[in-house]
Amino acid sequence: MENGEYAFILKKGYDSREVINTYRDQIESKTGEWLESIQDLDDDLLIEKAAYEYIMENAEYDFDTFNTMFQYTNGVPVEEVNPYNENCQNIVGFFMDGKVVCGGYARTMQYLCNVAGLDSLYIESGRREHAWNMVKLYDDWYCIDVTWMDTGGDATPESKIVNKSYETFRSNDDTSTNDPMSGMFRYHALGGLIQKMGPKCVKDTVEKP
């Protein structure tokens, strides 16, 4: 970003300039509409809420791509795997067709928070099974999982996946289950680098100054 202008870098090795321009135009247009809709909000918590509600209203979990990913990682031959949505893990997937998996949810949340003036980080679990966010509200950082909020239908302030400490996030996980969906959605083990150098999320209640 320079002088208030954002540059979109789309890592799409085989797309034409026309296709990339289409992505850019759509993202800029939708972003502008959303920013206009929240221009009267001046509170961190309300801006964050507007971001995740916008995502939940316009995103759909891409179960077809999830199944493809799960089959591939379990040794199913590539030719037997379903078609794969290559944009499911980024903001292009959200803004173009609304179909994403956890990476797309988290990248979009990070993007919307950032363009609206909130600090936000994209977080991957230690073995990259899942992605979520940390968002800075006022002077403290909190964990939030928009994927599980959308697919689990729980976006209330009382939820254990909305603006909670990292320890609360970890306490939600049940790694004893054999259900692959539970593991992919809810595995919140931090990678070593972010655990050592990242912001600390230690509060379970947002405290306004």
PLM region spans:
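Intrinsically disordered, low-complexity N-terminal segments that are enriched in acidic
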Residues: 1-11, 209
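Solvent-exposed residues in well-ordered beta-strands and their adjoining turns
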Residues: 11-13, 136
